[in-house]
Amino acid sequence: MATVIPSPLSLGEDFYREAIEHCRSYNARLCAERSLRLPFLDSQTGVAQNNCYIWMEKTHRGPGLAPGQIYTYPARCWRKKRRLNILEDPRLRPCEYKIDCEAPLKKEGGLPEGPVLEALLCAETGEKKVELKEEETIMDCQKQQLLEFPHDLEVEDLEEDIPRRKNRAKGKAYGIGGLRKRQDNASLEDRDKPYVCDICGKRYKNRPGLSYHYTHTHLAEEEGEEHTERHALPFHRKNNHKQFYKELAWVPEAQRKHTAKKAPDGTVIPNGYCDFCLGGSKKTGCPEDLISCADCGRSGHPSCLQFTVNMTAAVRTYRWQCIECKSCSLCGTSENDGASWAGLTPQDQLLFCDDCDRGYHMYCLSPPMAEPPEGSWSCHLCLRHLKEKASAYITLT
């Protein structure tokens, strides 16, 4: 019995247009990927395909050369690989050149003979002995310097410095080499981590890391000591610690929203530097406009925040919030946010839009979502504004 195939128009015009749009976007992305990755592996045949160079432009056309030929296109430059040609015919062997080494030696005086040669050899051995003695004296001086400062040495270097019966000089060289390696590593660490804690001496690469260290180590220790022991630390150390916080202008995470710097009109004054790269803009190397949080004033470059082009343009149209101040755009609360997902159900988590970075509770959406979607997700505002350019349409379903 014959089956009836329904017409596409009977399914609805909106459904048909949506299917065509998905097909168009898929073909566009497929062609873009094929032009970028060469050679690419054909998923149907399993063959690594290369660019065939059959697509030419009008500017490449030339006059026809053969009768009946309308156009000609320039050929690709082809170069044959060089290979080693084995000459089997004895008559085709390369010419043999005999270099007369004795002639220039005779012209320049040649090698000395008799007692003159012996004197030169004795002088060379004497120079070598002098150099060895100088090296030994230098090693002894370095050894004395190391013994004057024994606290700078590690246990392994002290063990290696113990003279052995077979290789006495080798053991000395190991200890000095280890010290040089440690000095080089220390200089590299000083260069890579310029921010130093004035209490424990720990180093960090950036200022936010140093601020985190102060908060979660020394500040917590001081608060506990104030409750348990009133005379635990001297006053000058605590005052220096608090003075460092004043110079740093750092605010704890729990008090950032309430103690952010505000203008006379009540608006939050944004920071003039990026909190991630501290103004270096290391990812792009180009100047970028900062994006500031409307609640705490923290700023960041779009490249440091890993924002797309759509997201960078969208965050300037509303009061953008950083990840620490993020709240639901529908209910306005920040409970059960994504920063503390441990022990929460998927419905209690904040879902972020991939086009505008707005946050939504999954139970605030209409209809509510039971679990986060796979791939990119766009909110209803971005779907209405961007339409087919939204991330949800580009993602394959």
Swiss-Prot record:
Q: Which residues of this UniProt protein bind Zn(2+) 3?
A: 328, 331, 361, 364
Q: Where is this cross-link: Glycyl lysine isopeptide (Lys-Gly) (interchain with G-Cter in SUMO2)?
A: 106, 129, 133
UniProt-listed GO biological process terms? nervous system development
What are the entry keywords? Answer: Cytoplasm, Isopeptide bond, Metal-binding, Neurogenesis, Nucleus, Repeat, Transcription, Transcription regulation, Ubl conjugation, Zinc, Zinc-finger
What GO molecular function terms would the record report? sequence-specific double-stranded DNA binding; zinc ion binding
Phosphoprotein as a keyword? no
- Identify the residues that bind Zn(2+) 4: 325, 353, 356, 379, 382
Which tissue types show expression of this protein? Expression restricted to neurons. High levels in hippocampus and cerebral cortex, lower in other localizations in the central nervous system and in peripheral nervous system (dorsal root ganglia).
The UniProt entry's GO CC annotations, sorted and at most eight, read: cytoplasm; nBAF complex
| Zinc finger (C2H2-type) boundaries | 195-218
The UniProt annotation places Zn(2+) 1 binding at 274, 277, 301, 304
In terms of InterPro entries, this protein maps to: DPF1-3_N, Znf_C2H2_sf, Znf_C2H2_type, Znf_FYVE_PHD, Znf_PHD, Znf_PHD-finger, Znf_RING/FYVE/PHD
Q: Localized where?
A: Cytoplasm; Nucleus
Task: State its role.
Answer: May have an important role in developing neurons by participating in regulation of cell survival, possibly as a neurospecific transcription factor. Belongs to the neuron-specific chromatin remodeling complex (nBAF complex). During neural development a switch from a stem/progenitor to a postmitotic chromatin remodeling mechanism occurs as neurons exit the cell cycle and become committed to their adult state. The transition from proliferating neural stem/progenitor cells to postmitotic neurons requires a switch in subunit composition of the npBAF and nBAF complexes.
Oligomeric and partner information: Component of neuron-specific chromatin remodeling complex (nBAF complex) composed of at least, ARID1A/BAF250A or ARID1B/BAF250B, SMARCD1/BAF60A, SMARCD3/BAF60C, SMARCA2/BRM/BAF190B, SMARCA4/BRG1/BAF190A, SMARCB1/BAF47, SMARCC1/BAF155, SMARCE1/BAF57, SMARCC2/BAF170, DPF1/BAF45B, DPF3/BAF45C, ACTL6B/BAF53B and actin.
Q: Which PANTHER family match?
A: HL01030P-RELATED, ZINC FINGER PROTEIN NEURO-D4
Report the sequence similarity comment from the record: Belongs to the requiem/DPF family.
Name this protein carries in UniProt: Zinc finger protein neuro-d4
Give the organism, scientific name: Rattus norvegicus (Rat)
